[in-house]
């Protein structure tokens, strides 16, 4: 399907994706969660760089599976898609038996703080057992590196800002955050005990085209475009460090390259700025072109008051520099949602 391939190559040039030294010759990679929001963007970047790719995704019903199917539209015929759950060890073992992977990008997870409070067992099964299955498979099949998508939620109610990788993490406040912190610890163990080179990346509120429909920017944009009321939890003073998806993908690729220099690292990948919920709503209003009717609801359990990434380490070691400011990114996202008619 040459048209799809050329489309991937065009996106790679447009976004400026670069794979540094692992781009010297084509490699084979596994991307778990590759049909999701971040995973599909990463998969396009890897294919555009000429790599062989297998995507492992269970296409679960956390949101409409048709969204994930559409995320992969440009990759049909370019990648192998394995439909399966990472918590099913038989699926993982079969995938690794049939392929010889140079590296694994592990983005598959049950996502979201609030749903994890309602169903912690599901989150532990997928995010912990699933991660362990993958690490074991890497160990036994000679995989060179493992990039793990962690989360800023591991910082919990840390009052020191910006958050640094060297900060003491006293306690997490949601099952989701606990599973991500456990994943980091498992990666550390496998790097130390078995020589698997692991990079753990703490993502800070990623947004952009294809983002999940349950995320705030998606919900606000959909509501405004459809003339519906916006639900705002709390007084709007909570603040987040929003990171555009293209910047996250660049950071992931740079971290994969860094496995040639270090066996284990933790990196913050964020926008290095904070935006309050009220400011965010105002930006979406401006991008859409009209004001919102807001319904205030109580604060939600498990939500932290503020996130803010210190990206000094990623800048120094990875050459990571977020390029898309929040106002520009919101405009891009609203334009995409309008053109996609996802309201």
State each model region's role.
Residues 21, 45-48, 84, 224-343:
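C-terminal substrate-binding subdomain of Rossmann-fold SDR/epimerase-dehydratase oxidoreductases
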Residues 91, 122, 129, 168, ...:
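Residue-level recognition of oxygen-bearing side chains
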Residues 161-162, 213-221:
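A glycine/serine/threonine-rich, flexible loop-to-helix segment
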């Amino acid at each position: 399907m040459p048209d799809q391939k050329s489309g991937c190559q065009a996106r790679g040039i447009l976004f400026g994706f670069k794979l540094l030294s692992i781009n010297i010759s084509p490699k084979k990679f596994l991307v778990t969660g590759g049909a999701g929001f971040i995973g599909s963007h990463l998969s396009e970047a890897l294919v555009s760089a000429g790599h062989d790719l297998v995507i492992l995704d269970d296409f679960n019903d956390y949101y409409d599976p048709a969204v994930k199917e559409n995320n992969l539209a440009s990759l049909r015929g370019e990648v192998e898609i394995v439909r399966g759950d990472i918590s099913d060890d038989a699926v993982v073992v079969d995938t690794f038996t049939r392929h010889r992977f140079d590296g694994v990008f592990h983005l598959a997870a049950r996502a979201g703080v609030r749903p994890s409070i309602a169903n912690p067992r599901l989150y532990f099964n997928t995010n912990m057992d699933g991660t362990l299955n993958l690490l074991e498979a890497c160990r036994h099949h000679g995989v060179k590196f493992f990039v793990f998508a962690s989360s800023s939620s591991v910082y919990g109610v840390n009052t020191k800002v910006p958050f640094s990788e060297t900060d003491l993490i006293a306690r997490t406040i949601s099952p989701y955050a606990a599973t991500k912190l456990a994943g980091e610890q498992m990666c550390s163990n496998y790097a130390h005990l078995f020589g698997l080179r692991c990079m753990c990346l703490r993502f800070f509120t990623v947004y952009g085209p294809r983002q999940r429909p349950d995320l705030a920017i998606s919900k606000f944009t959909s509501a405004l475009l459809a003339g519906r009321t916006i639900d705002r939890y709390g007084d709007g003073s909570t603040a987040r460090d929003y990171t555009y998806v293209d910047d996250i993908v660049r950071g992931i690729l740079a971290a994969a390259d860094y496995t040639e220099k270090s066996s284990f690292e933790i990196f913050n990948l964020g926008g290095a700025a904070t935006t309050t919920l009220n400011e965010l709503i105002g930006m979406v209003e401006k991008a859409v072109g009209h004001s919102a009717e807001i319904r205030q609801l109580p604060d939600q359990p498990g939500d932290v008051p503020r996130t803010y990434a210190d990206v000094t380490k990623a800048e120094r070691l990875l050459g990571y520099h977020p390029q898309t400011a929040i106002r520009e990114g919101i405009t891009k996202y609203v334009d995409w949602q309008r053109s996609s008619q996802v309201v």
